[in-house]
């Protein structure tokens, strides 16, 4: 039965399985624990919290989503034997919003795939350049295309840059993308902005490594893994400083 209601199983149905399997430690990797985790007789628990953006910027989320996230995240922090925050910023937010004791929280920074540290071959670079019709000189942005990511600011910056500089955006299209498209058309930037969706992971290092600079104007991030990917790729990074701490 539970296979038809996976989210309910994670919240309510998993604890009995922990006892049955004799699990010593359960790690909730993405912000939640079973709501009945304390009923597991022999299982200690750890939860990793990535960010609390829905509390810092509630205007970017639906009301019902904010309520669900707040309840699940708070309970996970309260019930866990240890809370892992992926940045000092996230740690401060957990303390501020959920009043979790500081000594219960450990900061463990994130990394990225080692493939970004390996120089792509000339053949691979040429392959992805032809596959995606990449320009010779481009600024790169990677991440979901949503208002919080502030990608429109990067598009606007092209108006102040030389004509030969282009912008390549990699990410999932959302309603916010329509606003970007409108600005592109209004300012005749169609030839200078390329938006790519569904790029295979195997192509990412070669795309990063051919960029002139990586730009990340996001208003808030718990960590910002694309910045690490760009640094590992050996390209300069321009990023907002409001939350990367």
Show which residues each predicted segment covers.
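Carbohydrate transferase catalytic cores enriched for Leloir-type hexosyltransferases
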Residues: 1-245
């Amino acid at each position: 039965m539970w296979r038809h209601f996976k989210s309910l199983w994670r919240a309510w149905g998993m604890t009995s399985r922990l006892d049955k399997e004799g699990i010593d430690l359960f790690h909730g990797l993405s912000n939640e624990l079973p709501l009945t985790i304390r009923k597991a007789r022999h299982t200690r628990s750890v939860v990793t919290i990535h960010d609390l953006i829905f509390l810092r910027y509630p205007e970017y989320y639906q009301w019902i989503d904010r309520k669900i996230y707040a309840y699940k995240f708070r309970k996970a922090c309260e019930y866990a034997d240890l809370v892992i925050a992926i940045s000092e910023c996230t740690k401060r937010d957990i303390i501020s919003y959920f009043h979790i004791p500081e000594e219960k929280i450990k900061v463990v920074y994130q990394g990225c795939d080692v493939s970004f540290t390996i120089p792509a071959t000339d053949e691979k670079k040429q392959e992805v350049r032809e596959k995606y019709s990449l320009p010779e000189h481009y600024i790169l942005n990677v991440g979901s295309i949503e208002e919080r990511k502030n990608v429109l600011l990067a598009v606007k910056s092209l108006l102040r840059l030389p004509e030969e500089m282009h912008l390549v955006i990699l990410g999932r299209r959302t309603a916010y993308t329509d606003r970007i498209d409108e600005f592109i058309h209004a300012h005749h930037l169609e030839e200078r902005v390329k938006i790519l969706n569904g790029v295979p992971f195997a192509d990412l290092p070669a795309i990063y490594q051919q960029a002139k600079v990586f730009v990340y104007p996001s208003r808030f991030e718990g960590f910002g893994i694309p910045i690490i990917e760009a640094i590992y790729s050996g390209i300069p990074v321009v990023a907002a400083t409001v939350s990367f701490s």
